[in-house]
Structure formats: structure tokens, C-alpha cells
């Protein structure tokens, strides 16, 4: 038996064509691996059978929904990760999990080569291949879409010439990637920055005006930075994301129209839908404002940004990212409590906070009777705080 190729299989055009193409061009058997990340759409058994129909000798479906939520989405929540302050890493956090399961499949099915369907223009090629280099540097990597400059038209022609059983159309306008954490849409008329998204771009979210008269108030509970309840009901991380996808999505929350800086050096326009992700990150950030000491919170905002950049850049398995997560884990010790939010008209509004770990002291903060803040200490504090400014002003202004 020739050495097998382990293919990251989505069920779409490119990876379906890749199964047949790899067999013809390399003579190697293909094992297709499809990962269920809560993306919805087609039944995964249908996807598995399609891989076999396209020529895979084996097709494996991995249910990684809970693993994805707890080991990939949760660190994103705890790091309040928004690349360029907007994008909650919808695709970026899924790639290292896919890599992990492809490497596992390679060991189990006699694979010496792993393959993906990424282009040479995007970030995902980096995320996959740096991931493979980190976990299994002995494996070879095959990237037919990138290395042989496939276009959609070429892929369709190959599928037709080789009777590959997949229904496609040259008119399909968008490239879509989705999982339970969110949905990413690009290409087509969206590549022209002045073009507004049309209704057919969206799937996870309703038009924000649909439920204009019925705002949704939700209370999210956290225990040490982990979402554990919604409106007092216990939930797993996956259940929290799924419920908030439905509720926030119904209010048009989580629509993002972004021009982002790709790792490869170009700017690209992306439309994201991430209702559950944006609500959870908003709630978690707000709870940290209540429970983290000032300097710790300030410093963590820097590490949050760096964590997001590392993940976006495909460095999930890097030493720095692991070190940052150790720091983040320490910061979550007191991030427990509840945040109340109103979801309405595409917006998230926080209107309530409570925590047994809160650093907010009512008696110190109030301006009413019972104020325990010693205002007589303020004059000396202000004098000392401004002392260096006063000294330098004397020199610089000649006073």
C-alpha cells in the first residue's frame, strides 16, 4: 500500500476535487477527514459519503464541537480576543484544532502526507502549515489549490471531466467558512469596498429591525472566566454559544463588515457574523472591569491584543502564546459573577453587573451620605502625582 494522504475535507468543491486529483497525480490513497465544529448545514454523514463517492479510501468524521468550544472558543473569550479590535477570530481558532485531528488521523491511518485546500492568498495556509510544523514536522504537506493555481473554473472543469459527484455553479458568489463561533463571507461583489452587503450575505443573523419592538434581556453568569449560566440556567460553553447565537442573531447582533490586514501583506474585506461570540466577549470584558485590579486590567489589555495577533497569524502552538495563556489563567481567578445585557437593534448594551469578587466599593464610590472616601487625602495625592510635571515645567518654561 502506498503512503496515504490525509486531507482536511470540507465537503465543498475544492476538497472534493482534491480527492480525485491527488489520486491521479500522486498515485496515493486519500483519507478524508471532516471536522464537525458546529457549522450546521449538511449532515456530516452526507459529507462523509461524498468523500467516499469522490474516491477517498476512507472518510472520517470527528465530532469536535465541545472540544472546540472548551479548548478554543473559551480561551478566546478569556483573552477578549478581537483582531484589529473587531474580528473574534472565527476561522483562525478553528484551524489549529483541524490540524490536531489531521495529525492524529495521519498516525492512525498510515499517512505521511497531509493536504489542505487553501489558496496562496489567505491566512489559512499559514495556520495549517505552521501547525503541522509544530505538531508533526515529519509530515509532508500538499496544497494543490495554492501550488497548482487552481481557480474555481478549473476546479469545476476537472469535476465535470472526471465525473466527480458534486453539484456546483460558476455563479456562486461567495466564499464562506463557518462554525459555531461564527461565519465568514468574502469575495464576489464584496471585494469592491463601496458595495454594501445584500441580504443574502447573512445567515446567522436577522435584519436588526425585525424584532425592533421586542428587545432581549439576558443575564450571563461566569465562574473563574468560564460562562456557566444563562438567565440562571446552567449551560456548557457550547450551549452558551449556541443559545446566544440564536438570541443575539435574532436581534441582528454580531454583524461585522471589516477591512483587515492579512498576514500575507494584503488588505481584504470580510463580512463576519458572530452573535454569540460578540455577546460573550462583551460580557466577559465587562466582568473583568468589575473584578480586575487596575494595573492588572491595564496590562491584560495588552496581552489580550497580542494573544489575538498570535492566533490570527497562525502561531497557536507558539511558546509565547502558551506563556500568555498561563498569565490569562491566573487573571481569571476572581472573574466570577453575572452580567446583564440588552440585545436590540444590532447592538449589545450592558445594564447590570454583580459579583461577590467585585472590587467596586459602593461606600467609596458614592457621592451621597455615607461616603467613606477620605477626600482630605486627595490634595496631597494630586500634588505628588503632578510633582515630576511641575519640576520639568520649571526647566522647560524657564519659570
Swiss-Prot record:
Q: Which organism is it from?
A: Mycolicibacterium smegmatis (strain ATCC 700084 / mc(2)155)
Instruction: Keyword check for Zinc-finger, yes or no.
Output: no
Q: Which PANTHER family match?
A: ARGININOSUCCINATE SYNTHASE
Query: Which pathway does this chain act in?
Result: Amino-acid biosynthesis; L-arginine biosynthesis; L-arginine from L-ornithine and carbamoyl phosphate: step 2/3
Show the InterPro entries listed in the entry.
Arginosuc_syn_C (IPR048268), Arginosuc_syn_N (IPR048267), Arginosuc_synth (IPR001518), Arginosuc_synth_CS (IPR018223), Arginosuc_synth_type_1_subfam (IPR023434), AS_cat/multimer_dom_body (IPR024074), Rossmann-like_a/b/a_fold (IPR014729)
Q: Gene3D superfamilies per the record?
A: Argininosuccinate synthetase, chain A, domain 2 (3.90.1260.10), HUPs (3.40.50.620), Single helix bin (1.20.5.470)
Going by the UniProt record, its keywords in alphabetical order are: Amino-acid biosynthesis, Arginine biosynthesis, ATP-binding, Cytoplasm, Ligase, Nucleotide-binding
The identity of this protein, by name, is Argininosuccinate synthase
Pfam families xref list? Arginosuc_syn_C, Arginosuc_synth
- Residues the record lists as binding L-aspartate: 119, 123-124
- Return the similarity comment: Belongs to the argininosuccinate synthase family. Type 1 subfamily.
Reaction catalysed by this enzyme: L-citrulline + L-aspartate + ATP = 2-(N(omega)-L-arginino)succinate + AMP + diphosphate + H(+)
Q: Does the keyword Translocase apply?
A: no
Enzyme Commission number, as recorded: 6.3.4.5
**For binding L-citrulline, which residues are annotated in this chain's numbering?**
87, 123, 127, 175, 260, 272
Highest taxon of the source? Answer: Bacteria
Instruction: Indicate where this protein resides in the cell.
Output: Cytoplasm
Q: Name one GO molecular function term.
A: argininosuccinate synthase activity
Tell me how this protein assembles. Homotetramer.
- Main location as per UniProt: cytoplasm
Its GO CC terms are: cytoplasm
EC category name: ligase
- Give the residues the record marks as binding ATP: 8-16, 117
Which BP terms from GO are recorded?
Answer: argininosuccinate metabolic process; L-arginine biosynthetic process; urea cycle
Amino acid at each position: 500500500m502506498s503512503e496515504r494522504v490525509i486531507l482536511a475535507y470540507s465537503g465543498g468543491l475544492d476538497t472534493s476535487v482534491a480527492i480525485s486529483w491527488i489520486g491521479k497525480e500522486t498515485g496515493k490513497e486519500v483519507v478524508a477527514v471532516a471536522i464537525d465544529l458546529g457549522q450546521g448545514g449538511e449532515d456530516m454523514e452526507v459529507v462523509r459519503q461524498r468523500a467516499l463517492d469522490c474516491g477517498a479510501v476512507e472518510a472520517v468524521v470527528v465530532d469536535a464541537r465541545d472540544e472546540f468550544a472548551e479548548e478554543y472558543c473559551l480561551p478566546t473569550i478569556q483573552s477578549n480576543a478581537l483582531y484589529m479590535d473587531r474580528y473574534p477570530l472565527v476561522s483562525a481558532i478553528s484551524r489549529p484544532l483541524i490540524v490536531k485531528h489531521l495529525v492524529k488521523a495521519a498516525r492512525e491511518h498510515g499517512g505521511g502526507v497531509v493536504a489542505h485546500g487553501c489558496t496562496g492568498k489567505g491566512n489559512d495556509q499559514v495556520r495549517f502549515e505552521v501547525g503541522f510544523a509544530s505538531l508533526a514536522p515529519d509530515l509532508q504537506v500538499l496544497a494543490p489549490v495554492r501550488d497548482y493555481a487552481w481557480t474555481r473554473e478549473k476546479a469545476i472543469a476537472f469535476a465535470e471531466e472526471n465525473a466527480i459527484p458534486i453539484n456546483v455553479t460558476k455563479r456562486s458568489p461567495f466564499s464562506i467558512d463557518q462554525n459555531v463561533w461564527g461565519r465568514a463571507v468574502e469575495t464576489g461583489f464584496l471585494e469592491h469596498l463601496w458595495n454594501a452587503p445584500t441580504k443574502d450575505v447573512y445567515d446567522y443573523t436577522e435584519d436588526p429591525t425585525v424584532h425592533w419592538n421586542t428587545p432581549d434581556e439576558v443575564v450571563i453568569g461566569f465562574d473563574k472566566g468560564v460562562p456557566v449560566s444563562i438567565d440562571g440556567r446552567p449551560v456548557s460553553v457550547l450551549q452558551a454559544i449556541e443559545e446566544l447565537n440564536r438570541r443575539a442573531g435574532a436581534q441582528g447582533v454580531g454583524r461585522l463588515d471589516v477591512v483587515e490586514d492579512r498576514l500575507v501583506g494584503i488588505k481584504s474585506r470580510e463580512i463576519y457574523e458572530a452573535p454569540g461570540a460578540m455577546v460573550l466577549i462583551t460580557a466577559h470584558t465587562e466582568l473583568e472591569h468589575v473584578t480586575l485590579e487596575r494595573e492588572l486590567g491595564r496590562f491584560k489589555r495588552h496581552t489580550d491584543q497580542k494573544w489575538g495577533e498570535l492566533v490570527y497569524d497562525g502561531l497557536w502552538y507558539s511558546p509565547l502564546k502558551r506563556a500568555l495563556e498561563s498569565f490569562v489563567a491566573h487573571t481569571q481567578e476572581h472573574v466570577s459573577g453575572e452580567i446583564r445585557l440588552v440585545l436590540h437593534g444590532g447592538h449589545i448594551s450592558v445594564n447590570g453587573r454583580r459579583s461577590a469578587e467585585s472590587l467596586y466599593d459602593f461606600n467609596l464610590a458614592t457621592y451621597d451620605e455615607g461616603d467613606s472616601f477620605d477626600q482630605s487625602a486627595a490634595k496631597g495625592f494630586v500634588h505628588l502625582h503632578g510633582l515630576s510635571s511641575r519640576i520639568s515645567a520649571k526647566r522647560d518654561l524657564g519659570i
